[in-house]
Amino acid sequence: MGRIAIYVVALIFGFANVTARADEKKYGPGVTDTEIKIGNSIPYSGPASSFGTTGRAQAAYYRMVNDSGGVNGRKITLVSLDDGYSPPKAAENARRLVEQDEVLGIFGSLGTPANVAMQRYLNDRKVPQLFVFSGVARFRNPRTYPWTMGGDLAFVSETEAFARYILATQAAPKIGVLYQNDDFGKDHLTGLRQGLGANAAAIVKTASYEPTDATVDSQIIELERSGANVVLIVAIPKFAAQAIRKIHDIGWNPLKLLAYPGATIPGTLKPAGLEASVGVVTAEFVKVTGDPAWANDPEMLAFHNFIKSYAPDLDPNDKLTVFGYYNAAMVVALLKRCGDNLTRENVLDQATHLKNVSIPMLLPGITLNTTPDDYSAIKQMQLQRFDGTGWVLIGSIVGG
C-alpha cells in the first residue's frame, strides 16, 4: 500500500507539473512581462513622405492602447524607422530592428519597394513581417514567403474591379495606364488584364515611371496621344497629383481611375487641384471620414476622439490617417489573440487563422479572414468617386 500511495502522489505531482508548464508564459525577442517591442520601416522622408502619416497614426494608436493598460497587461513599444522610400535603407532598417532592437516582429511597414527589400532577410530569420502596407501578390505567397502577410487589399483585386467598372460604363473603352515600374504597378496591370479578359486589347497604351523621376508629364502626354478615353493611374501621391494636374492642364477628359494607395485628398487631390480631381474613381475598404453617412457611427466617433486626444496634428480626413489607425488595430487584435504565448511562431500561427475578425473603420461587411494557404486578409472593397469635396460610394461591396 505504501508503494501505491507513493505512486499516486507522484502521479498527481506529475499532472500538476504538466499543468504548470501549460500555463507558462512563452516569449520571443522583444517581449517581457511588461513590454512587447515591435518595429516597422516607413517613408517619413523622400518622394513618398506623405505616407509618413500612417506611421504617425500607428504610433498614436499604440499610445492610446498603452494608456488603457496595454495588451494583456503589456505596453507596446514601437520602433519606427525612416527609410525615405529607399530599398537599401529599408533593408538596413530591417537588420537593425532584428539584430539591435531585437523586436518581436515587423508590423505595418509601408511601401512595395521597402518591403520587398526586407522580405527575404526577415523570412530567412523567421521574423514576422505582417500587415504590410502593400497589395502586391508576393506579400500573399505563403509557400515562398511564409513569414510575410499583407495588411490591405490585393492590387490585383482592385484593378479586376476597375475592369468590371470600365466594361459596365464605357461603350468603347480605350485604356491608357500610368504605372510605377515595380511590383506595385505591374500587379495592377495584371489585375486589369485579368479583369478585362477577352477585352484586354482595350488597353491601348502603358507608360511607366520610376520613383526617382522628377515628373510624369511626358508619360501623360503619351497616353493622351494614344486616343485613350480611360486612364488608370497607379502611382504614389506625388506622381498621382502630377498626373491628374497634367491631364487637366492639357484639356484631356478621360475617365480617371486611381489606385487606392495614391487616393488621398490631402496628399494627391489637393495638390492636383480639387476641380481637376472631380470624377476620379478609386477603390476603398475603410469608412470615409467626413461622409455624413458615418456622422453618428460609433467607430467614427471613436476615431475622432482618438484624433483629438492622441493625434491632433494629423488630418482626420486623410485616409492615410485611417490606414495607420486600422492597421495598428489589426496588430493589437493579433497580439491579444496570442495571450501569454508571444513567440514569433505563435504570432504567425494566430495571424494565419483569422476568421471574421472585425476591425474598427473597415466598411460594414468587411472582416479579416486568413488561413495558412490564404494570406489575403482583406478581400472586399467598394468603389467611390470624388465629387470635388469628398468621396461618394458607388454601388455595393464587391469581392470576397
What is each residue range found by the language model?
Residues M1-I36, V398-G400:
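Short, low-complexity disordered leader/linker segments with a strong preference
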Residues S309-V322, V332-W391:
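Segments of small-molecule ligand-sensing domains
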Residues P88-E92, A137-R140, Y145-I250, A293-N296, ...:
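Extracellular/periplasmic Venus flytrap/periplasmic-binding protein
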